[in-house]
Curated annotation (Swiss-Prot):
Pfam families: UPF0738
Highest rank taxon of the organism: Bacteria
Protein name stated in the entry: UPF0738 protein SERP0585
Stated family: Belongs to the UPF0738 family.
Amino acid sequence: MRIYINEIKLKDDGVYCFSEESTEGLEEVGQMLVDSDNYGFAYLLDDGQSYSYLIFVQETWSMLHENRDKKIIINNHLELKHFQEELDYVLNNIEGNNNYGKEFVSAVEKTFELE
């Protein structure tokens, strides 16, 4: 299942991300995938039977970058403890790597100030 983050609220203690789909019963896997065709990052969640993809589209990237030192909370209950580590890993892999597509790499490098 694809779960799209469609709202982000900043609070002193974290970045609160919300989706229309429920994330109850899901746990983080601690792995980030890249969807370069749709300009998104997909963070894996698991319910014990199957994976779900928590999608952070391009419009969310700047808030993630600007608040990288804050914890990420999904739907007020699910803290993503390995999110920043995984995002950093993916960003390091994307930087200068046109295998992801030149426009995607350029957008990532600009938003996350990798240039």
